[in-house]
């Protein structure tokens, strides 16, 4: 799963474990501006592969604590 705003990516392992990677707190409000996706929904990814890149300065200018909060949630 990749959100349209590019701030969150959902992953599912071969064994079915699901993980949500969420960058920042209110980064959904940026409407994708500071993010550059390197994968698309349905892609198979490997350890070490870059999933998303983002403009750290852009996020820090707007949301001082955004990059100090990275949320990873196992959903299964």
From Swiss-Prot:
Active-site residues per Swiss-Prot or TrEMBL entry: 22
Domain of life of the source: Bacteria
Alphabetic keyword roster: Cytoplasm, Kinase, Phosphotransferase system, Sugar transport, Transferase, Transport
Biological processes per GO annotation: phosphoenolpyruvate-dependent sugar phosphotransferase system
Domain called PTS EIIA type-1: residue spans: 1-76
GO cellular component term of the entry, any: cytoplasm
Pfam families noted in UniProt: PTS_EIIA_1
An example Gene Ontology molecular-function term: kinase activity
InterPro entries in the record: Dup_hybrid_motif, PTS_EIIA_1_perm, PTS_EIIA_component
Location in or out of the cell: Cytoplasm
Entry function: The phosphoenolpyruvate-dependent sugar phosphotransferase system (PTS), a major carbohydrate active -transport system, catalyzes the phosphorylation of incoming sugar substrates concomitant with their translocation across the cell membrane.
Free-text comment on this protein's domains from its UniProt entry: The EIIA domain is phosphorylated by phospho-HPr on a histidyl residue. Then, it transfers the phosphoryl group to the EIIB domain.
Name recorded for this polypeptide: Putative phosphotransferase enzyme IIA component YyzE
Originating organism: Bacillus subtilis (strain 168)
Taxonomic classification: Bacteria, Bacillati, Bacillota, Bacilli, Bacillales
Gene: yyzE
